[in-house]
């Protein structure tokens, strides 16, 4: 039930309105900064938004509100009209009234429709505006709309881009204030010249520019009309229809409207305008007719250039087939005979051979293998090729005749050959003088000799052959006759031979021959180089010492006095009956065995051949120490035995420093005993006489180095008669010290 107050008493008390009703209206607009009620009009709401909240909201003492007010600003302006009564029936403030929404006035939400615009400008340090920002805030039906627009100003240098779309042409129009030569007939168009100069750098725009953008074109009918107008304008001019090679495409017609969009490149017409002047043609001088001889000479030169290329005539003739080194070795004729039968162009050596003969490749390993064994000739043929290009004279054909050209060419080659021959002779004599000055000997006449050397001849042998000294092949039979002197026979002075250091090839050949025995060993002396008059060859067998050899099956006669037997260091078990029995004394054959051999790798360290002619016995500082001597006399597998009546080859690499006489015993299957021991020294002049005294037992320990039951004595030291030696056997069935013979020993013994 709604209570409607029909009247109001005028009593002293005042009716206080319910303020709680106003909260629902002021809460929505509190955020916008102004307080308005939904019942106010739109004009009152706009005015209320400009005032602070609470101003003019005081209580009035009259119903109309135009009475006295408690503030100065509470007066209501006249243009606002009379406000509605607060407590009347038609008041919109009262929610419980019947006419609160009667439709009078604007709706309640109309008070929030506002538009606010804010503009912000941004400037740089120079005061120039860079950006302009415009912000628009709209409140429509309680909804807030914010629009922000930012405008950027154009940077410097981009303003000329606005004029790219402007294609108007005003220079070609006839004006009263133009130049005089522009209006004259036949004068060039100034606009075309200016456009040529400005557009030369854009001639390759079609190649470098990116893909074309799609542009709107005029309809075909409009394009046809423009084409007709362009043709009419070209027909009015008096210029030729051609232009020079540097002309650029013409600009578009001035009748075309400027483009609406701003293009980023130059646009060319499909049918460019070409206007130019033909360059003057040069008149060629009339050719002079050539004679038949000149035509022939030109044809000959052209054919020669086509076949041989751009080379001079002397160099062309110098190209001859070169004789290989193998062909020179395989031929049986001498080089002088070949030089006589060979034309001078072919007989002249090549550049590589001349350098080899001059001494550019002395120590080259391949040059030793390729070196020719034939001696040098006195006349060295020079090379016809002239390596200095400045001195090469090119023969130009003479227009007189072909025969004169050929004669001049041959005369020129002969002169070159004679000059080159003189230069080569002078150089050859200077080389010979220098070589004789270095060697300190007089120059000897050199006689050519036929080479007998094979392919593997060393460098020193080849050089001795070139010097005129006969060199004997290592395959030839041995000859003890002295070699002829290599010195000159002018006077009594004999030049001394200079020793030469062996090269790598010499060492290689010597090592292969001496190590593996592919070929007989070369002749070497004790000093390691060839002597002048004496040549000692180690291929032959050295002489053996003068020692009488006895047949092993022969029994020594009883009347020969025997030397006394000296016992060894240890006591031996020898019975006197067996010592006195002369029938049991059987002399064993004597063999020659080396006590110690040293192998040397160099021929200079090898012992001289005179060491083979005498025996050097073993020498010991003390006669009591027989352990080392027994070890020296031990018969091992590597001992060298000289069989009786046979001679075995002694290697030159083995130097025999000591020779001792070792007994030879018959072969048995039992194990051999220890080696004998030597008790005294033997003189160098008399050969020692040795008798072996075997025994079955011996008290000398093996650690002391003494052999069991064997003692060797030697004769006097100064050539006196040898003392009698008696050899005693322990028993007839006792086995003597035996040595297992090798296959070669059995073979030599058989024959």
UniProtKB/Swiss-Prot annotation:
Record region (Disordered): 54-88, 216-290, 314-410, 431-504, 558-610
Keyword DNA damage applies: no
Stretches with biased composition (Basic and acidic residues): 345-356, 384-393
One GO cellular component term noted in the UniProt record for this chain: plasma membrane
Low complexity composition bias: residue spans: 216-228, 596-609
Topology in membrane: Peripheral membrane protein
Composition bias type Polar residues, residue spans: 431-496
Function in brief: May be involved in the control of meiotic sister-chromatid recombination.
One Gene Ontology term from the biological process aspect of the record: DNA recombination
The entry's keywords: Cell membrane, DNA recombination, Meiosis, Membrane
Protein location: Cell membrane
Name of protein: Meiotic sister-chromatid recombination protein 3
């Amino acid at each position: 039930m709604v209570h409607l107050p029909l009247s109001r008493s005028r009593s002293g008390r005042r009716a206080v309105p319910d303020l709680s009703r106003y909260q629902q209206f002021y809460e929505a607009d509190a955020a916008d900064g102004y307080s308005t009620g939904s019942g106010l009009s739109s004009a009152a709401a706009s005015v209320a938004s400009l005032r602070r909240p609470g101003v003019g909201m005081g209580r009035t003492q009259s119903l109309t509100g135009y009475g006295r007010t408690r503030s100065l600003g509470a007066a209501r302006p006249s243009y606002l009209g009379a406000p509605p009564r607060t407590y009347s029936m038609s008041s919109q403030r009262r929610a419980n009234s019947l006419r609160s929404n009667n439709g009078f006035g604007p709706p309640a939400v109309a008070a929030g429709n506002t538009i606010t615009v804010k503009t912000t400008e941004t400037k740089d340090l120079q005061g120039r505006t860079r950006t302009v920002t415009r912000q628009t805030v709209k409140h429509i039906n309680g909804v807030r709309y914010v629009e922000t627009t930012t405008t950027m100003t154009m940077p410097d240098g981009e303003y000329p881009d606005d004029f790219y779309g402007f294609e108007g042409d005003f220079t070609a129009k006839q004006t009263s204030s133009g130049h005089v030569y522009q209006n004259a007939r036949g004068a060039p168009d100034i606009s075309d010249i200016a456009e040529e100069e400005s557009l030369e750098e854009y001639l390759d725009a079609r190649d470098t520019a990116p893909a074309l953008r799609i542009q709107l074109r005029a309809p075909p009918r409009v394009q046809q009309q423009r084409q007709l107008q362009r043709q009419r304008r070209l027909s009015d001019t008096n210029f030729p229809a051609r232009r020079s090679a540097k002309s650029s495409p013409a600009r578009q017609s001035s009748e075309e409207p400027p483009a609406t969009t701003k293009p980023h490149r130059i646009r060319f017409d499909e049918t460019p305008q070409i206007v130019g002047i033909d360059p003057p043609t040069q008149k060629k001088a009339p050719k002079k007719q050539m004679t038949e001889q000149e035509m022939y000479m030109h044809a000959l030169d052209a054919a020669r250039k086509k076949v041989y290329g751009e080379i001079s005539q002397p160099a062309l003739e110098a190209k001859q087939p070169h004789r290989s080194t193998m062909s020179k070795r395989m031929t049986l004729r001498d080089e002088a005979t070949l030089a006589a039968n060979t034309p001078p162009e072919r007989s002249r050596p090549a550049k590589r051979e001349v350098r080899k003969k001059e001494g550019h490749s002395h120590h080259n390993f391949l040059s030793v293998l390729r070196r020719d064994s034939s001696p040098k000739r006195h006349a060295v043929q020079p090379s016809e090729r002239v390596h200095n290009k400045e001195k090469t004279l090119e023969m130009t054909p003479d227009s007189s005749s072909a025969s004169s050209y050929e004669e001049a060419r041959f005369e020129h080659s002969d002169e070159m050959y004679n000059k080159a021959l003189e230069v080569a002779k002078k150089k050859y004599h200077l080389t010979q003088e220098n070589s004789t000055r270095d060697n300190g000997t007089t120059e000897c006449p050199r006689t050519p000799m036929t080479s007998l050397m094979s392919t593997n001849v060393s460098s020193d042998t080849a050089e001795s052959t070139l010097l005129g000294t006969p060199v004997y092949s290592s395959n030839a039979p041995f000859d003890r006759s002295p070699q002829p002197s290599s010195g000159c026979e002018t006077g009594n002075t004999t030049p001394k031979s200079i020793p030469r250091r062996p090269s790598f090839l010499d060492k290689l050949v010597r090592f292969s021959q001496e190590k593996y025995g592919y070929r007989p060993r070369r002749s070497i002396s004790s000093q390691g180089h060839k002597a002048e008059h004496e040549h000692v060859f180690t291929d032959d067998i050295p002489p053996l010492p003068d020692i009488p050899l006895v047949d092993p099956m022969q029994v020594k006669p009883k009347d020969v006095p025997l030397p006394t037997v000296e016992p060894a260091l240890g006591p031996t078990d020898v019975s006197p009956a067996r010592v006195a029995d002369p029938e049991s004394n059987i002399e064993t054959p004597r063999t020659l065995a080396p006590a110690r051999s040293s192998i040397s790798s160099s021929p200079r360290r090898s012992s001289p051949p005179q060491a083979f002619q005498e025996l050097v016995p073993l020498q010991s500082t003390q006669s009591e120490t027989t352990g080392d001597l027994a070890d020296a006399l031990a018969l091992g597998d590597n001992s060298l035995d000289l069989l009786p009546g046979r001679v075995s080859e002694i290697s030159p690499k083995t130097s025999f420093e000591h020779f001792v006489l070792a007994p030879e015993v018959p072969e048995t299957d039992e194990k051999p005993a220890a080696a004998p021991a030597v008790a005294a020294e033997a003189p160098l002049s008399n050969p020692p006489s040795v008798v072996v005294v075997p025994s079955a037992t011996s008290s000398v320990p093996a650690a002391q180095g003494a052999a069991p039951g064997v003692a060797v004595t030697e004769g006097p030291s100064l050539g006196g008669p040898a003392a009698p030696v008696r050899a005693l056997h322990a028993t007839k069935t006792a086995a003597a010290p035996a040595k297992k013979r090798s296959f070669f020993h059995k073979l030599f013994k058989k024959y």
